[in-house]
Amino acid sequence: MAESFGVKMGVEGEKEFKNALKEINSAFKVLGSEMNLVTSQFDKNDKSIQSLSARNGVLTKEIEAQKNKVQTLQAALENASSSFGEADSRTRSWQIQLNNAQADLNKMESELKANEDAIDRLGQEMEEAEEQTDDFAESLSDS
């Protein structure tokens, strides 16, 4: 009897996790459309601070949603593992989804880091250009 209760709880818990993942995936569709909007507002090769900052804003939201997805998948995996056992196909399916979600999170975080580095480089280049302009203006006034 206790075993059937555990399986019942596992199945019901699995339904809840699937519903939670549907909500998260729906949020990703909205974020994907937001990224498409940002991309359409700037040339694809636009590396301006404004363009990179806009992408960072959306990437940050995507990363938060992805972290939520990873947490949900971790909980689903734990639930399936305790309810069905680690060798069960449902447990393995959750493990695969978790691995893929974690890999996607790693990619998103790398992209965000690359954008932040590009913003920093652009900021430094702007400062250097400003200093050179000031130096040039100063040399003209000295002449």
Model region roles, listed by residue range:
Residues M1-E16, A20-S143:
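Residues at a specific register/face of alpha-helical coiled-coils
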